[in-house]
Amino acid sequence: MPQESPIEFPAALPPELRELWSQLSEILTAFGDAQDRLDPPKIPEYADRLAPLAAALEKTVHAIDVTKLDRDAPAAVLTQSGVQLLGAASRFQGARTGPHEILKAFQALRPIARANDILFPLANRFVEISEHYLTPARRSDVSLRESLAKAAANPERGLMHFNNQRGHRGGYSLYVPENYTPDRAWPLIVALHGGSGHGADFLWSWLRDARAHGCLLAVPTSRDRTWSLHSPGVDAAGLNRMLDSVSGKWNVDAQRLLLTGISDGGTYSMLLSIVKQSPFTHYAPVAAAVHVLQNREGRVEAPVRDTRIYQVHGAVDWMFPVEKARAAAQALKDAGAAIDYREIADLSHNYPRDENPAILRWFSPELFESN
């Protein structure tokens, strides 16, 4: 009897799983849109969008008996991810009414990262899931998907966690593109979560861009509930150890080190930008209190001349008013910083993943030359 040929990955999902994946993909997209543009007045709108998607997914998930499946079987993995998403959708409905609607909404979205944790190991096995973890502009790139899948078995590639399990603080998560080779230097993105956040959650804000464009991605977790804004050296020591460890094992381009972050993470990135010995070459604070660098007269007297900054702020940010962001950007420019200020009309106090390509193009145009 002739042996069956081994399956070459990435392969198409089996027909019996395509409806489930279609539903997962649709609700993940809806959740992603909510995460990117969540604003208190928009919570009911997003809840209305999620409700029918969750109802359809729930029906499909409940029809699958996972007790009869191996834990790592694709059907079981997709179902486990679906359970996380259904929990998030249910909790999000509770954010329609107060008090503290925005806090409820943020808490409801936390299982999305766990759903991604479960799904991502299938990205290099199945075309549809691989496409989901790429930027829209790169999803049709067959050669990219194949190069990622062929090298996926290497234990020093892909997604790794270093003392960064949820519940632990002070560690970091690292993504090394599966098609990494040590014969050239690779750019590194370091992304800092917001207050009360965690690196293992925030990494999903950047992973598809790093995977699509060939960047290493390090996402640390602050030692305390947020970054050491009043004593920058506390968390800086951990960041330096992380950089030393990553650079010692992988070929990191010291001329392309991006430090970005959301809210407190963005504020902390700006505090590090004025440190003379900072190893970072570019800074991209998002929804941050950049005005902390200004003195009482509104001037920036810190050494920022020629510092490369891409500042992103939402016109409807409810935490840090946009007027302060505009004034800080002008003060940085007056002080000699090489600053690009990007104001997004419909952005509140969120991380806008759709701005990542522009940040990367500013950071390293070479990443787009062959795309």
List the predicted regions and their residue ranges:
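Gly/Ser-rich "nucleophile elbow"/oxyanion-hole loop immediately N-terminal to the catalytic nucleophile
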Residues: 178-184, 228-263
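A domain-start/cap signature at the N-terminus of enzymes
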Residues: 2-185, 371
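C-terminal catalytic histidine-bearing segment of alpha/beta-hydrolase fold enzymes
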Residues: 322-371
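Short beta-strand/loop motif that positions the catalytic acidic residue
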Residues: 310-313, 317
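Short substrate-entry loop that stabilizes the transition state in hydrolases
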Residues: 180-228, 292, 318
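Short, proline-enriched alpha-helix->beta-strand connector loops that line the catalytic pocket
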Residues: 303-309, 335
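Active-site loop/turn elements of alpha/beta-hydrolase fold enzymes
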Residues: 222-224, 288, 344-346
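Primarily recognizes the serine-hydrolase "nucleophile elbow" in alpha/beta-hydrolase
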Residues: 202, 247-248, 255-305
